[in-house]
UniProtKB/Swiss-Prot annotation:
Protein name: Transmembrane protein 11, mitochondrial
Primary subcellular site in the record, as a coarse category: mitochondrion
Keywords: Membrane, Mitochondrion, Mitochondrion inner membrane, Transmembrane, Transmembrane helix
Taxonomic source organism: Mus musculus (Mouse)
Gene name, Swiss-Prot/TrEMBL: Tmem11
Lineage: Eukaryota, Metazoa, Chordata, Craniata, Vertebrata
Record-level GO cellular component terms: mitochondrial inner membrane; mitochondrion
Family of this protein: Belongs to the TMEM11 family.
Length: 190
């Protein structure tokens, strides 16, 4: 594997990549072991316990629950990005377009940003799954004990701090709300 080879560093660097062992508190594996008719419920319970225990890495072997979790995280990411991009469009459109026409783009973009931020806040903000992202980096995946798995396509979640991300989309959505209220007041009150 290429991930096991030497890493090229800039001038003066000569380090090599080594396989880093993870402690038991870093990684949790939801194994795909069907031991009864309620196996799916057991997988979901194990995943929920792992999320609440805040493991750095969670490996999900069962395909169905892994795919559902990855989709849930993807939808949350989409809402976050839409809130940020629509809010940014709302705030910067008046700078790029004539003032007479900018509200045709900035007001709907502001409403979209606020709607996505609100939906994220209601549905995702307090879900322990929102603290995780799906890991695709081959080098980081090579550090995990994936050789012990029975599934060939596990979903790997990595815990990431989302405080700055939440602050960003909340701040932009709030600024978009303030702009929209100001613009609606100017359009209809004056």
């Amino acid at each position: 594997m290429a991930a096991w080879g030497r890493r090229r560093l800039g001038p003066g660097g000569g380090g090599s990549r080594e396989r880093v062992s993870l402690s038991a508190t870093d990684c949790y594996i939801v194994h795909e072991i069907y031991s009864g008719e309620n196996a799916q419920d057991q997988f979901e319970y194990e995943l929920e316990q792992a999320l609440e225990a805040q493991y750095k890495y969670i490996v999900i072997e069962p395909t169905r629950i892994g795919d559902e979790t990855a989709r849930w995280i993807t939808v949350g990411n989409c809402l976050h990005k839409t809130a940020v991009l629509a809010g940014t469009a709302c705030l910067f459109t008046p700078l790029a377009l004539p003032l007479d026409y900018s509200h045709y783009i900035s007001l709907p973009a502001g409403v979209l940003s606020l709607a996505c931020c609100t939906l994220y806040g209601i549905s995702w903000q307090f879900d322990p799954c929102c603290k995780y992202q799906v890991e695709y980096d081959a080098y980081k995946l090579s550090r995990l004990p994936l050789h012990t798995l029975t599934s060939s396509t596990p979903v790997v979640l990595v815990r990431k701090d989302d405080l700055h991300r939440k602050r960003l989309h909340n701040t932009i959505a709030l600024a978009a709300l303030v702009y929209c209220v100001k613009k609606v007041y100017e359009l209809y009150a004056v």
